[in-house]
From Swiss-Prot:
This is Uncharacterized endoplasmic reticulum membrane protein C1709.03. Pfam families: DUF6859, Vps3844_C. Residues 20-385 are lumenal. It comes from Schizosaccharomyces pombe (strain 972 / ATCC 24843). GO terms for biological process: vesicle-mediated transport. Residues 407-428 are cytoplasmic.
Length: 428
């Protein structure tokens, strides 16, 4: 990831922050397959939300999940709603993860409740820093590469993490963005924007980038092969318009509707999505930039030391030389077990996984078995064995039934049934 991107995040965050200060309202998070109860949407801290997002992106081994964390219940619900068994038989699809600044909860997905809310919502600049941390962790896990396919000069970015694909950047000009916007939403709405104004140009370019992203995700969804790419985006154009023109301005109202339209399109073509809606910043806050910078740095807490099993193992490469090394390398067995000595071997510590019990909407308990070196994978061996042998036995019974019917059909009928002689009744 380039230094230019970090510099743009910093400058963009400063620009928006100086205009409005710090916001402490709640952010709303929408996730595919997970919807909160209308009257009981859970609210968690920014630090707990970091753990949930890390699980969603597959980098939870970098983050320590405490036993009494507010994130644990939500993660268990995610595990219950997305069956590992179904993903075993069906191809994985791309994961879309977007943060949208300047959009409130009630303005999106009327029929869908947020999965959860984030209390004391950090700024968009803090979320941008968090996304960068996730991207570094993704790259270190699979030696993949995160490519910035779109980048503007106030912190907006769209990236794709993929270990195999090569992606070109989305480039446009102010005139091209305005022309494309007019084709999408009409001439009347396009006439409200002035490409000589920086905030207008940024928003139009983000709309153009989202349109290209919709086309990209649509083509991906039609492919039958597995797709493990992850799209991570940070959109700040709407927030910039809010700061420039105000929440009651016509241009902001139109831009908000445009953003909701494109997010709904992404929702339709993306099988797995996460939308983080950051509400418009409250301009009444008077905190200084120095205070805000400190808040941004501490907003999501600290993850564990960024290593991926780089601690020393013993000579056979299967055990860790100490309990501490095992605990650090596996993030305390991903919170699903504990490190203990293996047999009678000296300097050999491995994870002993334990089961988790989650409840579904009907109040029924479900046991989740964990496996793997760091207890980070669900053990579906029992379900697989049941499905496998059920299929084999069922297929065998089907063949046996067909053969039995075929053999019966080849036998000659008895003489009584095949006789054509007419029976004549005698009279006396």
């Amino acid at each position: 990831m380039s230094l230019l991107r970090y510099f743009i995040f910093f400058i963009g965050g400063c620009t928006l922050a100086l205009a409005s200060g710090v916001s402490y309202t709640e952010a709303s998070v929408y996730m595919s397959g997970l919807s909160g109860n209308e009257n009981e949407v859970p609210s968690i801290s920014p630090s707990d939300s970091r753990l949930v997002f890390a699980h969603k992106l597959g980098v939870s081994r970098f983050h320590k999940l405490k036993s009494h964390s507010g994130a644990r219940k939500i993660i268990n619900e995610m595990l219950h709603s997305h069956s590992e068994l179904s993903s075993f038989f069906y191809a994985e699809k791309s994961n879309t993860f977007l943060t949208i600044a300047g959009l409130a909860e009630s303005e999106l997905f009327d029929t869908l409740n947020p999965a959860f809310r984030i209390s004391s919502c950090p700024s968009s600049n803090a979320f941008a820093s968090l996304m960068c941390r996730y991207e570094r962790q993704l790259d270190s896990l699979d030696n993949g590469k995160t490519t910035d396919i779109y980048l503007n000069d106030i912190g907006g970015v769209i990236s794709i993490h993929d270990s195999t694909g090569v992606y070109s950047q989305i480039t446009t000009t102010p005139y091209k963005s305005l022309e494309d916007y007019e084709q999408l939403f009409g001439e009347d709405k396009a006439s409200m924007f002035d490409i000589s104004v920086k905030q207008d140009r940024v928003f139009l370019s983000e709309i153009y980038a989202l349109k290209i992203l919709v086309e990209f995700l649509s083509s991906k969804s039609q492919q039958e092969r597995s797709d493990t790419s992850i799209v991570i985006g940070q959109l700040v154009g709407l927030e910039a318009l809010y700061e420039k023109y105000g929440k009651d301005s016509k241009i902001y109202q139109v831009a908000r509707e445009n953003m909701m339209t494109l997010l709904s399109m992404i929702k339709q073509v993306s099988s797995t999505y996460t939308f983080i809606l950051l509400p418009p910043i409250d301009s009444s806050e008077t905190s200084t930039r120095y205070h805000k910078r400190q808040v941004d740095m501490e907003a999501f807490g600290e993850e564990i030391e960024e290593v991926v099993a780089s601690y020393e193992k013993n000579y056979n490469g299967r055990c860790y030389i100490s309990e501490e090394a095992c605990s650090k390398a596996t993030n305390d067995c991903s919170g699903h077990g504990r490190c203990s000595k293996y047999g009678q071997l000296d300097s050999c510590y491995v994870c002993q996984c334990s089961n988790s019990v989650v409840s579904n909407a009907a109040g029924q308990n479900k046991t989740i078995r964990w496996a793997g070196e760091s207890c980070s994978k669900q053990d579906i061996s029992v379900e697989f064995q049941f499905f496998f042998w059920f299929t084999i036995i069922g297929f065998g019974l089907l063949i046996f039934s067909i053969m039995l019917l075929f053999s019966i059909g080849q036998e000659e009928l008895a003489n009584v049934l095949t006789s054509t002689a007419t029976v004549i009744k005698k009279t006396t």
